[in-house]
């Protein structure tokens, strides 16, 4: 049932060409007993224009992992830090956020951060991954490299033993590199922007936030604990992200929408996912 919800493609992006059945379930299995998780998010489509997609999903998944005993850290760039912090604050989560600076040697910075914080798992939710030509591209095929730090270097520099998870909805995000053959068949537009940065586990959804929520539901089913946030939390997170400077990644408007879908569409998706979660016997319901 989680797959059916994540495969819903209201934006008509054609994710059926590269949807990965069971992706959320496999990611949850890999994350269930994680010790130290470093999560990244943030996709800026212009100067000072971070998206509303990504931070809510990251905050929700981070909260779930922390509830299961993991040490959770976050990393993003300066532009996307305020929306991520805002989403975490809505859920009452600690805001331990590292900032990845765009200047200098990104590969060296990534190796230093990995050595210093020693995560066992790396998770990216709606974060741009470089395309074949080395640039970072929006779904419109426009370069966004100037406004997004090279956080994909964390995945490129990660040792093989480290578990990596990538969540995306357009093919141009970190992790989608393992789907290059499928993305090539999805059409010229998707093929052009497709990321070459791989992850061991990939989750594709109609909206990246939903992909993260799908992992949370699968974690809830595995642990028999209610972990997903509420529809009201969803509304508050998106509004808080906008208040912190985020915009809709498609309309580019500073309003409480995500990927051109109204707030109630996202609240409704959370309600549906909570129904799936609550169909598994556990000790109670999330607040």
Q: Where do the model's predicted regions map?
A:
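Histidine-anchored nucleotide/phosphate-binding helix
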Residues: 51-71
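A short helix->loop->beta-strand "cap" motif at the edges of active sites that frequently abuts
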Residues: 69-70, 158-164, 172
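Short glycine-rich anion-binding loops that position phosphate/pyrophosphate groups of nucleotides
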Residues: 43-45, 127-130, 170-171
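An acidic, phosphate/nucleotide-engaging active-site surface
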Residues: 86-156
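Short internal beta-strands
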Residues: 70-79
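C-terminal functional extensions of proteins
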Residues: 173-287
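Glycine-rich, charge-decorated loop segments at or immediately adjacent to ligand/cofactor-binding or catalytic sites
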Residues: 82-87, 165-168, 172-184
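Positively charged, low-complexity intrinsically disordered leader regions
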Residues: 1-36
